[in-house]
């Protein structure tokens, strides 16, 4: 077996082993894997603020009310400040939470983000290379919302129902404040439970609490390119430990 092929096999083994080890570590306490109230509020406010930002520039004017016999005219209300805009933004708001994935390689609330997780991308890459990966479910179901994300969605619905009047108050009277601050810090969470609101994704991978340097990132990219070039030559199918999809 040549050194390049041996290196590829070693990389594949370490990739699966790293993902598996991280999952086993979190399986010790299932409650730690459930989203916190802070995380639910953060995602709820993020999604609503984003939807309102998307529709905020509309110049549409709504005609409200009916023309009465008295001759009273309909009211003209800009869509950008109308109740209709808020109602449309709230419609299916929590359904959009199902677009999120669990990124087990990230910490805290950054664990929840849209798009495919790094771990899942790695595992799919292994499958494409012919490596057998067992998540306990068919391959075609890998991209379905996980139990954790489904729980997020249900908690979003519960929170929205409970604080819908507060959201309305913010929309009509307090939009000078970020919704996250007004809703989560001001009404939903105790002061001691707001830490997740300060967590921000920088787009850089975090290892042991420190960001990787540019040199380290470039070195890893070069190594990955070399491994991918050699990976095209692989045809063998390996056997690896069964993984838990909930932490991908």
Swiss-Prot record:
GO terms for biological process: positive regulation of protein localization to plasma membrane. Residues 1-21 form the signal peptide. Disulfide bonds join 38-196, 41-184, 94-156. It is found in: Secreted. Pfam families: DUF3456. GO terms for molecular function: signaling receptor binding. InterPro entries: DUF3456. GO terms for cellular component: extracellular region. Keywords: Disulfide bond, Secreted, Signal. Residues 213-230 have a biased composition (Acidic residues). Residues 200-248 are annotated as: Disordered. Residues 231-248 have a biased composition (Basic and acidic residues). The keyword Cell inner membrane does not apply. Its main location: secreted. PANTHER family: CTG4A-RELATED (PTHR15382), PROTEIN CANOPY HOMOLOG 4 (PTHR15382:SF3). Belongs to the canopy family. Plays a role in the regulation of the cell surface expression of TLR4. Interacts with TLR4. This is Protein canopy homolog 4. It comes from Homo sapiens (Human).
């Amino acid at each position: 077996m040549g050194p390049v092929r041996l290196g590829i096999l070693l990389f594949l083994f370490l990739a699966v082993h790293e993902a598996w080890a991280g999952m086993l570590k979190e399986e010790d306490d299932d409650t730690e894997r459930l989203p916190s109230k802070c995380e639910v509020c953060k995602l709820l406010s993020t999604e609503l603020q984003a939807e309102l930002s998307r529709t905020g520039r509309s110049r549409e004017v709504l005609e409200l009310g009916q023309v009465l016999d008295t001759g009273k005219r309909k009211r003209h209300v800009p869509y950008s400040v109308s109740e209709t805009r808020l109602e449309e933004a709230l419609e299916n708001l929590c359904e959009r939470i199902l677009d999120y994935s669990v990124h087990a390689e990230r910490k805290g609330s950054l664990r929840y983000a849209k798009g495919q997780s790094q771990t899942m991308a790695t595992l799919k890459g292994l499958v494409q290379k012919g490596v057998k990966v067992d998540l306990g479910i068919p391959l075609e179901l890998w991209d379905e919302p996980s139990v954790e994300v489904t729980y997020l969605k249900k908690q979003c619905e519960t929170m929205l129902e409970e604080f819908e009047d507060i959201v309305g108050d913010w929309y009509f009277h307090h939009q000078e404040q970020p919704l996250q601050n007004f809703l989560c810090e001001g009404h939903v969470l105790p002061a001691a439970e707001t830490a997740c609101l300060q967590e921000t994704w920088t787009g850089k991978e975090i290892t042991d609490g420190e960001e990787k340097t540019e040199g380290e990132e470039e070195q890893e990219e070069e190594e990955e390119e070399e491994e991918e070039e050699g990976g095209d030559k692989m045809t063998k199918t390996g056997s690896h430990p069964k993984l838990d999809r909930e932490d991908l």
